[in-house]
Swiss-Prot record:
It is a single-pass membrane protein. Keywords: Cell membrane, Membrane, Repeat, Transferase, Transmembrane, Transmembrane helix. GO terms for molecular function: phosphatidyltransferase activity. The keyword Membrane applies. This is Uncharacterized protein jhp_0176. Belongs to the phospholipase D family. Cardiolipin synthase subfamily. The chain crosses the membrane at residues 1-21. GO terms for cellular component: plasma membrane. One of its GO terms (biological process) is cardiolipin biosynthetic process. Residues 162-189, 396-423 form the PLD phosphodiesterase domain. It comes from Helicobacter pylori (strain J99 / ATCC 700824). Its main location: membrane.
Length: 502
């Protein structure tokens, strides 16, 4: 067995690292004045008068977030840069792929950077776009083995590299508009999945923050572990499917009636957008992102530093929503100190029944009861949240995916960063720190609404229990709600795993 692993290791190390360093130099990005584009001209006057400010539109609703992406693609004139951790091959993803293809046909330069962990298949529609003359697709830190079922062997042989992923999410249009937040590309991020939908949040920013996001994208795009699709071992087989590009419109599984309705909604969005009918917030926005070299060598996290600084400086309240919550000893000390000063700490995260990572919940449990006893308001998402919130939809489960923090109803940290060791030390992340009280209050109200529909963890006779209101009746649970004994047992077993590796 040892000999087998040694041979496997040599094979993978030679294969993976050889692949990484053969990356050709990409064409330089095109240069233009973003204020002269359709989108840029809409906000040119206000932002040129206040060059230190950025403008923001909050995207709370999943379907609205999809409309913004599609609408921005249709209004684009020069370039689109997309960076994401997950790109599924479902309805929403196919719609966006089709829109990107249409933009490229108009002459828009499109660059797509995907993490290999979140790619459904080398033969997904998004990969086919690489054969268009105006579209480039790269894969970040790819596996040498392209068959997903066999990748566990590569993980054993090259674990230190494979575990480090690009978790950033950026959607940059014409170097002027950028969507930043927690949403990947897939049906369950846009409230369009019948099995599981994610509660999430992102925002559309205009102005200076977009140029900083663009700089970050360029760093990742030129990084030696961003590999062109043309260098993947499956490229020749993928090329055989190149004719499928022309059939993207036909492949989307949607009725003519639904297609017409969607078309109407996109056109309505564009009209409202160009008439400034969406609430717009102006303020100082700081773009924060890890360097891509973080996956090769330990580097400090600018987002973690900004979070800890804002947490220490909070004077009144902090509201944290994080799908994964493993704060660690240092942050727990800050929490304790701030609560002792009378600062209100609210935490919203996943329950055992709503999480998509049982091992992470096992680690969260080490801190959960301590936080309740400290005096923090701790909430866990109910997995039937969506069914109770939106009538007529039949999603069987809902899960928190957002990563948003509001400090003193004034400052908002929004992006891909979870409060856990993986975001701090292993993955690369991106976020924006936005200073606008009205925006912060709107975000807090949204998070508060989620919390009120969730389980509230409270002390009862020195024990932490789950409490919620259902049809006006207060209900209690002594164990993790909506879970089986077997699920709770797996959670207990998972606690043997080291926190830093989760």
């Amino acid at each position: 067995m040892k000999i087998f692993l040694v041979i496997l290791s040599v094979f993978f190390f030679n294969g993976c690292f050889g692949l990484a360093y053969k990356t050709p130099i990409s064409n330089p990005p095109i240069s233009y004045d973003p204020y002269t584009t359709t989108i840029g001209s809409l906000y040119a006057k206000n932002l040129k008068e206040n060059p230190k400010h950025s403008a923001a539109i909050l995207l709370e609703d999943g379907f609205d977030a999809l409309l913004h992406r599609v609408g921005l693609i249709r209004m684009s004139q020069k370039s689109i840069d997309m960076q994401t951790y997950i790109y599924k091959n479902d309805l929403s993803s196919q719609v966006i792929a089709k829109e990107l293809l249409n933009a490229a046909n108009r002459g828009v330069k499109v660059r797509i950077l995907l993490d290999d962990n979140g790619l459904d298949s080398d033969f997904s529609d998004i990969m086919l776009l690489n054969f268009h003359k105006n579209i480039e697709v790269k894969i970040f830190n790819p596996y040498y083995i392209r068959n997903k079922g066999l990748r566990y062997f590569e993980m054993l042989a090259d674990y230190e590299r494979i575990k480090k992923r690009m978790h950033n999410k950026l959607f940059i249009v014409d170097n002027f508009a950028v969507i930043i937040g927690g949403r990947n590309i897939g049906d369950n991020y846009f409230d369009n999945d019948l099995d599981t939908n994610f509660l999430d949040l992102d925002a559309l920013f205009f102005g200076g923050v977009a140029s900083k996001a663009k700089e970050s994208f360029e760093n990742y795009w030129r990084f030696h572990r961003s590999i062109p699709v043309s260098l993947l071992r499956t490229h020749k087989r993928l090329k055989n499917n190149v004719k499928e590009i022309a059939k993207l419109h036909e492949k989307i599984p949607i009725s003519a009636e639904d297609a017409n309705e969607f078309e109407k909604k996109v056109n309505d969005f564009i009209e409202r957008f160009q008439k400034y009918q969406y609430p717009i917030y102006y303020g100082n926005a700081i773009f924060l992102a890890d360097l891509p070299a973080k996956i090769d060598t330990p580097l400090y996290s600018p987002i973690k530093i900004a979070f800890e600084k804002a947490l220490k400086n909070a004077k009144d309240s902090v509201f944290i929503a994080s799908s994964y919550f493993i704060p660690g000893k240092k942050i727990m000390k800050i929490f304790k100190n701030q609560i002792s000063k009378g600062i209100e700490l609210n935490i919203l995260t996943n329950s055992l029944s709503s999480t998509d990572a049982i091992v992470v919940y096992g680690a969260w449990e080490r801190y959960r009861n301590k936080l309740v006893r400290m005096g923090a308001n701790v909430y866990e998402i109910r997995n039937d949240f969506f069914n109770r919130q939106i009538k007529g939809r039949f999603s069987t489960k809902h899960s928190l995916h957002g990563k948003t923090i509001v400090f003193d109803d004034a400052l908002t940290l929004l992006g891909s960063f979870n409060i856990d060791p993986r975001s701090a030390y292993i993955n690369t992340e991106s976020a924006v720190l936005f200073d606008n009280p009205s925006f912060a209050k709107r975000v807090r109200l949204s998070l508060k609404d989620h919390a009120q529909q969730s389980w509230h963890l409270v002390l009862y006779r020195h024990r932490v229990i789950w409490e919620a209101t259902e049809e006006g009746i207060l209900i209690h649970e002594k164990n993790s709600p909506d879970t089986s004994f077997f699920l709770r047992l797996i959670k207990e077993w998972s606690k043997v795993l080291p926190e830093r590796e989760l």
